[in-house]
Structure formats: C-alpha cells, structure tokens
UniProtKB/Swiss-Prot annotation:
UniProt key word Metal-binding: no
Superkingdom per UniProt: Bacteria
Keywords linked to the UniProt accession: Ribonucleoprotein, Ribosomal protein, RNA-binding, rRNA-binding
Alphabetical list of CDD domains matching this protein: Ribosomal_L20 (cd07026)
PANTHER family: 39S RIBOSOMAL PROTEIN L20 (PTHR10986)
Organism per entry: Desulforapulum autotrophicum (strain ATCC 43914 / DSM 3382 / VKM B-1955 / HRM2) (Desulfobacterium autotrophicum)
Gene: rplT
Family: Belongs to the bacterial ribosomal protein bL20 family.
Entry's Gene Ontology cellular component terms: ribonucleoprotein complex; ribosome
Alphabetical GO biological process terms: ribosomal large subunit assembly; translation
One Gene Ontology MF term: structural constituent of ribosome
UniProt keyword Cell inner membrane present: no
SUPFAM superfamilies, per the entry: Ribosomal protein L20
Function, in words: Binds directly to 23S ribosomal RNA and is necessary for the in vitro assembly process of the 50S ribosomal subunit. It is not involved in the protein synthesizing functions of that subunit.
Full protein name: Large ribosomal subunit protein bL20
Amino acid sequence: MRVKRGFKARRRRNKVLKLAKGFRGSRSKLYRTAADAVDKALGYAYRDRRAKKRDFRKLWIARINAASKMNNISYSKLIHGLKLAKVELDRKVLADLAVSDPAGFSQIALKAAAQL
C-alpha cells in the first residue's frame, strides 16, 4: 500500500513555521528558508546560553575589581584574602554587594586585607 505522508509532512512543516514566527520576510513564510533560519537561530541560542554564563562572570569580576580598587586592594589579592579568611561569598554576591552596599563591601575588603 502506498503511503502519502501528507498529514505528517504538513505537521512537521507547520512546526518549523511556528518556530519561525516573528522572523522577517520569507524567513517566516517559506518552509525552505524558514527551516534554514530556525536551524541557525537554534544554534545561536545554544551557543549564547553558554556564552551568557561567561559574560556574567566577566561583568561580576569587573565590578568587584572596580570596588576593590576603591578600597586599595587588587582583585586577585581580595579573592586570595577571602579564601584565607574562609569567607565563602561567590563573585555574583560580591558584585551585588559592591554595587548595592559599598560600605558592606569595604568591611569584607578589610577582612580580606587583614589575612594577607
């Protein structure tokens, strides 16, 4: 018996076109260009979910470095001093403290400097 696959093929194509919604021009209308655009977009999304983690870590380090320089200690010495003082604050929390509570960050920097 011959199988025509009409329903299955339509469903598969509609799934791709649904993912391409919001793309410009033929990339959201024509299956072939939409399929290419969706593949590319999913690849970028996969890549950038990983890059996001690196980007945020870079941002946190830049903020901590700026705040630690204001307290006359380098970033690397601050982190080393915190490890010696057994202060287990991660970079995300330290960066947030540096921005939202500079006085609190200064206390932490003093504690780190005392251990060096």
